[in-house]
Curated annotation (Swiss-Prot):
Pfam families: Swi5. It is found in: Nucleus. Residues 28-54 form a coiled coil. Keywords: Coiled coil, DNA damage, DNA repair, Nucleus. One of its GO terms (biological process) is double-strand break repair via homologous recombination. It comes from the Eukaryota. This is DNA repair protein SWI5 homolog. One of its GO terms (cellular component) is nucleus.
Length: 105
């Protein structure tokens, strides 16, 4: 099978103008913007509700930061247990038992 190397390239990706009419695309974008504005309003309302219940955004951000730090430390601990298990020729499950840890820890 021989192909013409001088033929023009035809992209499999359709350009936005060729995939749908201008009006349909504009309507679709307006609908999407409207839906996003509705979601934003709902989230703003939820934030206001939480703040009225005594929650603060700063406290939430601090909590999220601490959760990220905890998860990173947990990942490092699991990696070290895995390496130790390989060096000892045992399973990590056995190491968890040796150190008095639950598998869910």
């Amino acid at each position: 099978m021989r192909r013409n190397c001088n033929a023009g390239f035809k992209s499999p990706v359709q350009s936005p103008s060729s995939s749908s009419s201008g009006r349909g695309s504009e309507y679709s974008l307006q609908k999407e913007v409207s839906e996003l504005q509705g979601k934003e309003a709902a989230l703003d309302q939820e934030i206001a509700q939480l703040e009225s219940e005594g929650f603060s955004m700063a406290e939430l951000e601090e909590h999220i930061t601490l959760l990220h730090e905890y998860n990173e430390l947990k990942d490092v601990g699991q990696m070290l247990l895995g390496r130790l298990a390989v060096l000892r020729g045992v399973t990590t499950k056995e190491l968890y038992a040796e150190f008095g840890m639950n598998l869910e820890d």
